[in-house]
């Protein structure tokens, strides 16, 4: 590419800007992480009104030499949509910072906060494997995570309490938000059920919320022993240490929240077959409830599609899984011996899928 070949200067400079933007796109993620670690969303929230830059700097745990740099961090956070500028008083020019819907999800004590998910995914332990992506394409390791650490993500987490705890809390924070929407928009999915097993349910945030909402419904969380060790159940909630590839406790319905995207097609079929063995016939109310992504095909907006693509790449880094479109989901269900399914798109970038034997 050169100007002599008919490429005009504007096109060349636009292409350069596009490359630059992608080189430095990680800065948005690191700025977000920094804002959380400094407590910026909570400080602004606790202020109770638009917070000026000097007021914010006075509250931040920053070295005096860094106070003049805070504005630059705030500027990228505003540009990224995590904060907004608003006049402090009507009729005056002075502006202060306020939270947006996105930054309200980052408050430390908010019940729907996904702060742990941000900190977990941007932890150096989980960003390191991305630097091994090209090396992985040239070897036969299962994942780039394996290339970076010489063992699988699940094996690493099972032996490293720091990663295990941060990952479980990240999944729990996502579960709290998702369950609040599910119980508001999709309560009917649990109608007629007397028992449910949450496979790979972690610390049980989803199952606990379902058990509280439906006191007659007996809920069981199935996960690996190091995940459920020491967890206490309740009247209609209990924990079961086991392997979903081996056997799943019998129940009217099996819940798979964000599980199947971790695994290859062959492994998904094995899991689904274990699910089918654990539930009664459709006539007797048996079904599998799946919460997962269905990849859009030119249906969503640019950012939604891009976010799903990000998740698919993330699966490639950490697990042998992938995000799937509807045709790929349907093939899994048929290969596992199920007869039909129903999709209810009420969970944002994820969908509620009911699969019947």
Swiss-Prot record:
Keyword annotations of the record: Methyltransferase, S-adenosyl-L-methionine, Transferase
Q: Extract the SUPFAM superfamilies matched here.
A: S-adenosyl-L-methionine-dependent methyltransferases, Winged helix' DNA-binding domain
Give the EC number.
2.1.1.240
Q: Pfam family of this protein, just one?
A: Methyltransf_2
Q: Name one GO molecular function term.
A: resveratrol 3,5-O-dimethyltransferase activity
Q: What induces it?
A: Expression in leaves is induced by different stresses, such as downy mildew (P.viticola) infection, ultraviolet light, and AlCl(3) treatment.
- Indicate the transmembrane segments per the record: none
Q: What family name appears in the similarity comment? A: Belongs to the class I-like SAM-binding methyltransferase superfamily. Cation-independent O-methyltransferase family. COMT subfamily.
Q: What is this protein called?
A: Trans-resveratrol di-O-methyltransferase
